[in-house]
Structure formats: C-alpha cells, structure tokens
C-alpha cells in the first residue's frame, strides 16, 4: 500500500461487536477496551468506526450526529468504490478489499485502519478525469462538514490536477448518459423450441460461465421445460408447467437455456419473475453465460422493477437544493451522487445502492438520502415534462425491457402490470406502453405465487393510503415539503380546455375531504381525545372503536371482522363512500378529457406531450378506475351490512407503533387470489413455467395438487405438465435434523439458553428463526453478551439498525457470526458455505390463524391445508442449509410438539431424530467438527 502523507494520519480505530466487546487500534498493536472507555472514546475523541450508529448502539448510546470527530469507514468506501458491494462491518470491508477475514474484535480493529489506508491510496491513484470529478465533490462535502473531507482531498491532490474543477459535484444528472429511443420491437413470434437444442444451449452456457458440464438432471430440466416455450394451441389455454427441481439441480441455467433460445427466435421477451432480490441478482449474474460481453448483456438482459425502486433525479435535485440551503443531509446526498454516477441502473432498493448508507449517522428521516425520499413512491412523475427525462433511470429501464431478450422482474410488478393491462383491455384501450406483452413468463420461487397474488389483488382503505391519495391530488401542503400535485403535473397539458381544467379543480377541491397533515394524531391521539377532520378520518375513528370493542389484543395489532358493523361504523362508512365518490368523479372526467386529447390531436401532439399524457393517464387509471371503486365497494358493503361474499374476506385492523395505535384500515382480500391471478396473468399468456425447489408435497396422493391450487394451474381447462427432479446432494451424509424434546417453547429463558448453547456448539454460523418479534427480542437480549464473550457476533432483525438484506450480507461475510430473524427471513437467506451451518426454529411455523387464514382453511381443506403450508415452510427453511455439494448443516426444532408428519417434506435421506437438548448440542458439535 502506498504510504500516506502525514496529513492523512488516521485516528484510533474502534470496533464494537454485538454484546459490547470492544477493541481499538492505532499506530501500535490492537488491544481490547472495556465498554466505559469505548463509550468515552466515541463521545469525545477523534475515532474511526465502521457504521457509527450500530457501534454507538452496541455501547448503549444513541446514534451520533455527523461530526468531524467521527470518521466512518463505510462512508469512505462509498466514496472510493461507489456502487460496489461490501457488507457493512469491519470484517465485511476487509473481505471486500481482498484481505483475509479478521477474526476477533482486536483483529477487526487493526483491519479497519488497514482498510482505510488502502482506500485512500486507491483514491490517490485515481486517473484523470475521474480525479477532478471526485475532487470537486469532496471539496463541496468538506465545506458541508464531512469528516473525511480533508483526508480525501489530500489523497486526490497528492498528484497534480490538470484542470480546475467547476461546480459542486452534486449535479450528477448532467453526467449520466441519456437513453435513446428505438423503433418498436413488435409482438413476439411463435416459433417452436427444440428440446435437444435446449440441452445443447445449456452446455454452451455452462462452458461460457467456466462451469462443469451439465448434470444429467439439469439437462433433463432444460429439455423438459422447453415444453412451456412451444406455441399454444388455443386462446386462454397457455402451456403451463410446474417444475420442482431440488437444490443443486441448477434450475436457473436450466430454464435460461430454452428461454434464451425462444427469445432469439421470437423475442422480445421472456420475463423471469422472482420473489426475492437475492435471486434476481443471481439470475443476472448467471446471464453472463448467455451474453459474455457486458455491453451486449446490458442490452439483452434487463432488470425491471416498479418506479418506486429507482432514484428519481428530480427528487434528488430538489433534495440537493434544499440541503445547500441548510435543510438536508448534504454529505449523504454527495455520497448518493457518487453512487448514481457509477450505478448500473439507479436501483435503490435491491440493486447496487448501499442500503446501509442513510443509517450511519442520526439524520432526521425526512431529509435522509434514502430510497424513501429519493424514489418516486407517490406517482408524482411528470414524465416528459421533467428536465431530466432523457437521463431518467426509470425510462431507461422501461425502454430497455421493450427490446431485451430476458427481463428479470418480481412477482409484484408482473401481477400489477398484468392487472392494469387487463383493466385497460376490458375498456377497449391498448395496454400500458411501459411493458411488452407478457407472453412467456418463468415464475422462479413459484411457491410464493399465491402470497404475491394475495398482495397484488387486494384493497386497503387506511389513513396512510387515503392521505397518500390526497397528496397525489393536491400536492404537499406542509411547509418545506417537496412534491408535485395534479395541478403542477397537468395544468400545462390541459391548457385552455375549460372542461378539463374544471375537472382538475373539482378533484383538488374534493380531495380536501381526505386525511391531511397530522391525521394519525387526530384519529388515535395518545391522550385518547380524538378529533377527526373529514369523513374518512371519522370512519377510521369508528373502526378503531369497533376494534377495541371486539378484537383480542395480539402481538401484531388488533383485527376484527368488518361485519356486522356498529351503527357508528355504518353511518361513517356511508359518509366516507360519498366523499370518495366526489373524488372519483372528477378524476374519471379528467381521464376522459386526456384520452380525448390523445385521440383528437394525435397528429399534432409532440412526442414529449404524448408521453406526459400517457403517464398521467396511468396514474389516473390506477386511482380512479381501480383503487377508488374498490374502496367504495368495501364501504357500501359495510353501510348495508351485506351478507358476506364467499369470494372475499373483509376485515378491520389497527397498526401499532411503540405500543399505541397509529393507523387503522378496512381490508378486502380474495379468499382464493388465484382467481384474479389466472384471469389477469396466466390465461392471457402463451407459456408459463412455475419452478421452485419446494413445489410438490409427497404426502398427497397427487404431489402437485396443492401447487396446482396455489398457482392457478387448477383453474385452467387442461392440467399443467409437471416435472419433479430430486436434489443431487447427499443429505444423509451432510445434514442432521433434530427435534428437541425437553425445552419449554413458551419459556424465553429456556429457548434462549438452548439457542445460545447450540450456537456455541456450532462455533457460530447459526441462524435462529422466530415466529414472533417479541420472542426474538427476548432471546437476543439474553444471549448477545454471552456469545460475544466467546467471540461470536450476534446480529438480529428488528434489533440492529439495518435492513434485513444488509444483516444477511454481514452474516454471509463473517463466517462465525450468528443471526436472528423472523420466519420470513428464510426466503432472503442465500448463504453457501460454512457461514450457515446451523438453523434453529424456536417453534413450529404454523400459519397465523387470523381472519383471512381461517376463511382459506375452511375453503381449502382444514387441517390438511395448515399441514401443507407448515410442511412447505420447513422444507424451504431446510433448503437454506445446503447450497453446495460440500456444505454441511444441522437443523434443530425447539418445539417438542412439532408433528413428525410435517417433516416428510425434507429431502430424501434426512433422518429426523427426537432428542434431549444435551444430546442435540453434543451431536451438533461432533457433526460439524468433522467438516
């Protein structure tokens, strides 16, 4: 590493592990430090840390504000290596720079200094013109109080500067390449795919990726799934296939082989839909086998997400302007500018944006440089009316997806887009111009289709949702708030069309009846003195009153059936429905005026104006033709105290925060969401492949019966094709599974002690899964310090100030760390190797018996339905343990009452043993020690 100038001397490095164990490193050897001295150091002295907020929290302190005293190595990494991955810890940084994993707190403190020296030396070697670009931004951030300012400027000025930099460096929108329009790609073709050619393509892909030749099961998978890419025979009857491929078969490459052949012959495009971000990233990586050239791959493989995932350059510019006037996080925005310049696609919620960046210091949530403030969550986009339209990340992704061979998306986007297109088609309009026809779809992680459809095809009238609608129509009404209402977005478009202007003003006036600023404090104040403004808030107050009268308090809030409703709920529902009708009518009128404008002036409209109108119509359609009618339908049923519709479940619930109600909602879900899923997504498609490692259920006479019901396949005229391939892994040799029979699952002390000793027996690498947040926190409180004393770091969802993806990144990077999470975490954990070698459930993951689940259990088979869901959850969790042929893992259930029949979904060769805790601990230690 290049020696640094004396002016760049680093302060003392401080690392604090979960549990409070601390160490410091300066010019001499690293040494451990007692917590009181560590607290004094971070509060008073210059100090170098990795994640200031998490470091302070482990010492029992609040997150510090920005200070020139506290240098966070993660900020330096974000500046020097923007849009490049690191786990947000000292060990994670060391691994990201190619250093060996530092084990133990003292080694991590020493490594932290070395990491910063390497990064500053790397910065000193930055070539022109990147050096000038970095320098101008660093000088701006230094004036804004950035603790790394002097060190970064010193490194950049260690070599001559060719040109004097100009500007602030924050104007990233002026340096992002613009997109270019292309001719329409046309509709996809229907040429068949040869199964043998799919096998040959698989061999090519594996060879390009530098992998071994295909396993026999992988070749079978590629050839058999080609069936879903053949031409369909009849309208409304897609070629649908359910394919279970056990872990290790290689299903991703297996379906990319026929998908890429089909796209070459017929495209665009095959849509590959996933449930988790981790799998999206994996598919994108594996697509390198199809298109080795990065430039070609960028055109041919596009990750497509909803607008609410991408950095909005206009929001960013407005935030920068505010921060330069003293109202914002200038440093955070500067680091975000560095990221945006380097980002592959501007995705802030699962792409290359460091999600840990906004949480490093105590910054008010409203001004953080976070996705919540910088993406277009509120549908406020002005489309071609935006000065950054040609550089827009969202527009770039939209256009890219129209011409790509493979579009990688998520279940939510595919379903919402299909539902929207279906609604437009039903009115005789063309589909959304943002998306190509969804002719061929691969649903990976297909076991989540039911849950994704449940979310996509539901309705919720809540304080937050209705307040968001008010803001979308009227714009921000508080002081200093950013945003754009309908008037700002549309007045220029409607021009002198008096009827359209009147409709716009009527909508703005009617929206005043929706909840406004401070609504939560009025409907559920801490002192109980409610003061609702308007009919929607009055309805929500009545809902909360009914909930308190009828609901049993639970861990996650209150819920009660919507009907029979109290007199107050019925009366306020009628008034709320009338208010919503007054909002809906002018929005519909405005939509019709805009449709007329497109029709009547089609030969005169500039392309930019057409894009603005079509964008406005998308927002109006979703709200005036989908959301508002859904809300009014729910309210009408409540007002009339109607008989329950057998296809729907209506209920009320309340949201709690810090122990008190902050919102209430009226919800409507389909009992069977595969009905709209089939109508909107599956039936219009030509070919559907649903795949997962856990689709079938061996305990059923027909192993795919439950999967057919939960994917919509059972609703098609013809049964789907099915394929089932076993995992090639040797589970009998590489796994152990225990049910512990002598731990009281309802005693937090016993559960904590059991989990602690199991984690110690494994030497770390343990994942603890809980079915309730309360129990997770209770266990964490009891075991974090004892594990830290033994050198094992314990991270926890809902405890550490990081989103779960960042926690999983740390868990993956630090081989001997442990992680606690809710049962839902199992879906996002893709951790091969020794980092995950022990998985412990606190109790059986039964489905929560809420109102919605009770209705489904009655519809779908009672106890057998519950068993099927629990069995699948166990199988999915077990599948996290073994990701490669040489992995070893232990599965432990701490619920003695767990029925043996539910473990029948575990892979062939796994033997379930019911043992006492001591025996489980000894067996875990002995088995993993052999690996």
How would you name each of these model-derived features?
Residues 234-258:
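Walker A/P-loop
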Residues 89-159, 891:
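Acidic, Mg2+-coordinating catalytic module of metal-dependent nucleases/exonucleases
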Residues 728-746, 799-899:
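Conserved RecA-like P-loop NTPase helicase motor core
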Residues 190-243:
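Conserved pre-motif I regulatory segment
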Residues 773-798:
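Conserved helicase motor "Helicase C" RecA-like lobe of SF1/SF2 P-loop NTPases
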Residues 371-402, 418-429, 596-741, 747-749, ...:
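A contiguous, basic/glycine-rich beta-loop/short-helix subdomain that forms a polymer-engagement track
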Residues 192-203, 268-269, 274-405, 412, ...:
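A substrate-engagement module of RecA-like helicase motors
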Residues 11-123:
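Conserved DEDDh/DEDDy metal-dependent 3′-5′ exonuclease domain
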């Amino acid at each position: 590493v290049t020696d640094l100038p004396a002016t760049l001397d680093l302060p003392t490095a401080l690392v604090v592990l979960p549990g409070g164990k601390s160490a410091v490193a300066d010019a001499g050897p690293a040494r451990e430090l007692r917590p009181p001295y560590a607290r004094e150091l971070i509060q008073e002295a210059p100090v170098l840390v990795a994640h200031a907020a998490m470091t302070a929290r482990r010492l029992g302190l609040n997150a510090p504000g920005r200070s020139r005293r506290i240098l966070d190595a993660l900020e330096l990494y974000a500046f020097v290596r923007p849009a490049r991955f690191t786990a947000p810890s000292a060990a994670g940084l060391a691994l990201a720079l190619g250093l060996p994993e530092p084990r133990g707190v003292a080694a991590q403190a020493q490594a932290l200094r070395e990491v910063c020296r390497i990064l500053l030396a790397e910065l000193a070697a930055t070539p022109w013109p990147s050096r000038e670009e970095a320098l101008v931004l660093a000088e701006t951030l230094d004036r804004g109080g950035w603790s790394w300012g002097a060190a970064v400027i010193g490194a950049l000025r260690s070599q001559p500067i060719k040109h004097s930099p100009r500007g602030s460096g924050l104007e990233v929108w002026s340096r992002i390449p613009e997109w270019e329009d292309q001719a329409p790609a046309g509709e996809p073709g229907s040429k068949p795919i040869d199964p043998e050619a799919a096998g040959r393509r698989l061999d090519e892909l594996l060879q390009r990726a530098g992998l071994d030749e295909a396993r026999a099961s992988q070749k079978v998978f590629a050839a058999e799934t080609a069936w879903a890419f053949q031409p369909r025979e009849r309208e409304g009857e897609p070629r649908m296939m359910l394919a279970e491929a056990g872990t290790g078969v290689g299903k991703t490459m297996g379906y990319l082989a026929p998908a890429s052949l089909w796209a070459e012959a017929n495209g665009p495009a095959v849509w590959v839909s996933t449930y988790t971000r981790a799998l999206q990233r994996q598919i994108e990586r594996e697509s390198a086998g199809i298109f080795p050239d990065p430039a070609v791959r960028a055109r041919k493989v596009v990750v497509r997400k909803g607008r609410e995932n991408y950095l909005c350059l206009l929001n960013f510019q407005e935030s920068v302007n505010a921060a330069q006037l003293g109202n914002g996080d200038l440093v955070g925005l500067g680091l975000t500018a560095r990221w945006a310049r380097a980002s592959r696609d501007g995705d802030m919620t699962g792409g290359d944006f460091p999600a840990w960046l906004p949480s490093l210091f105590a910054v008010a949530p409203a001004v953080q440089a976070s996705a919540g403030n910088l993406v277009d969550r509120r549908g406020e986009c002005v489309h071609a009316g935006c000065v950054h339209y040609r550089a827009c990340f969202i527009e770039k992704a939209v256009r890219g997806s129209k011409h790509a061979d493979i579009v990688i998306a998520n279940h939510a986007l595919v379903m919402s887009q299909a539902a929207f297109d279906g609604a437009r088609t039903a009115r005789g309009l063309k589909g959304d111009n943002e998306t190509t026809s969804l002719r061929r779809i691969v649903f990976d992680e297909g076991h989540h289709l039911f849950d994704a459809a449940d979310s996509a095809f539901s309705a919720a009238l809540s304080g937050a949702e209705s307040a968001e609608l008010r803001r979308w129509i009227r714009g921000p009404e508080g002081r200093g708030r950013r945003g754009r209402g309908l008037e700002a977005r549309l007045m220029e478009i409607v021009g002198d069309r008096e009827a359209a202007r009147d409709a716009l003003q009527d909508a703005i006036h009617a929206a005043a009846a929706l909840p406004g600023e401070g609504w939560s404090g009025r409907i559920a104040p801490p002192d109980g003195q409610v003061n609702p403004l308007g009919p929607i808030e009055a309805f929500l107050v009545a809902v909360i009153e009914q909930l308190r009268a009828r609901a049993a308090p639970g861990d996650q809030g209150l819920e009660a059936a919507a009907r029979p409703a109290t007199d107050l709920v019925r009366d306020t529902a009628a008034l709320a429905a009338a208010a919503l009708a007054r909002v809906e009518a002018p929005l519909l009128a405005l939509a019709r005026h805009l449709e007329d404008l497109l029709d009547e002036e089609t030969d005169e409209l500039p392309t930019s104006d057409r894009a603005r109108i079509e964008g406005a119509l998308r927002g109006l359609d979703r709200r005036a033709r989908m959301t508002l009618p859904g809300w009014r339908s729910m309210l009408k049923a409540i007002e009339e105290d109607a008989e329950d519709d057998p296809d729907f479940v209506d209920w009320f619930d309340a949201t709690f925060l810090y122990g008190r109600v902050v919102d209430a909602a009226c919800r409507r879900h389909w009992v069977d969401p595969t009905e709209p899923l089939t109508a909107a997504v599956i039936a219009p498609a030509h070919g559907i492949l649903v795949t997962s490692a856990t689709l079938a259920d061996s305990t059923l006479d027909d192993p795919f019966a439950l999967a057919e019901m939960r994917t919509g396949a059972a609703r098609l005229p013809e049964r789907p094709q099915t394929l089932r391939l076993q995992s090639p892994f040797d589970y009998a040799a590489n796994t152990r599974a225990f049910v512990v029979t002598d731990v009281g699952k309802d005693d937090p002390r016993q559960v904590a002690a059991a989990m602690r000793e199991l984690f110690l027996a494994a030497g770390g690498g343990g994942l603890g899964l809980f079915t309730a947040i309360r129990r997770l926190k209770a266990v964490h409180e009891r075991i974090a310090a004892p594990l830290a004393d033994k050198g094992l770091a314990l991270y926890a969802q809902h405890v550490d100030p990081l989103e779960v993806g960042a926690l999983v990144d740390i868990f993956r990077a630090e081989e001997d760390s442990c992680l606690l999470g809710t049962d839902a975490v199992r879906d996002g954990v893709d951790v091969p190797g020794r980092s995950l070698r022990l998985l412990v459930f606190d109790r059986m993951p039964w489905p929560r018996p809420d109102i919605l689940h009770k209705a489904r259990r009655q519809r779908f088979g009672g106890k057998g339905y519950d068993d099927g869901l629990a069995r699948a959850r166990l199988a999915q969790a077990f599948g996290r343990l073994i990701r490669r042929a040489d992995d070893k893992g232990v599965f432990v259930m701490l619920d003695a009452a767990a029925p043996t029949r539910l473990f029948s979904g575990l892979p062939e060769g796994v033997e379930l043993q019911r043992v006492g805790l001591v025996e489980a601990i000894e067996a875990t230690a002995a088995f993993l020690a052999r690996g």
